[in-house]
Regions:
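Nucleotidyltransferase catalytic core that binds NTPs
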Residues: 1-169
């Protein structure tokens, strides 16, 4: 009996990545292992104010993920994540869970997405304790006081750190 060819698993991991953190990078690394192809998608919300413009966030993501052969970076706007996942042919949506409130929100979104397209599976990952509290808003909040550079450096990838230094010069 012949083995059936395995359908390629492709994931989409979306966020604002403003800025990209080591927590995001952990998620991307796991996604690159789980899926044959992973699209890291910067979602653009026209009602949200960003620290870095879209093009800069895309550049930082590309620089930080260039060592992954199966990871691509893109952006989308004015559409739901599930619609974007359908558009690019993703079989899975990858989401990170850091807290109970993250879980409650993501569970609700998973249920809604399942109603819209049950063929796209949502995968939840929980980051290790050492980076579970790291968020873009936390990083933004650390920037400014004397010595911020030393503290922030451990929470962001090198390309992001260099841009932060440049933007604060």
């Amino acid at each position: 009996m012949r083995a059936q060819p395995r359908k390629q698993k492709s994931g989409v991991y979306a966020g604002s990545f403003d800025p990209l953190t080591v927590g995001h990078m952990w998620m991307i690394e796991q996604g690159a292992r789980l899926f044959d192809r992973l699209t890291v998608a910067v979602g653009v919300n026209p009602d949200k104010k960003y620290t870095f413009p879209l093009e800069e966030r895309l550049v930082m993501l590309r620089e930080s993920t260039k060592h992954f052969r199966n990871v691509s970076v893109a952006s989308f706007s004015n559409r739901y994540l599930i619609d974007y996942a359908q558009l690019i042919g993703a079989t899975h949506v990858l989401r990170g869970i850091r807290t109970e409130s993250d879980y409650e929100f993501e569970r609700t979104m998973r249920n809604i997405n399942g109603d819209l397209d049950a063929s796209i599976c949502t995968v939840f990952l929980m980051p290790p304790r050492g980076i579970a509290e790291v968020s873009s808003s936390m990083v933004r909040g650390l920037i400014g006081p004397v010595g911020w550079q030393k503290i922030v450096r451990k929470y962001v990838p090198e390309p992001v750190y260099k841009r932060l230094l440049k933007s604060r010069a």
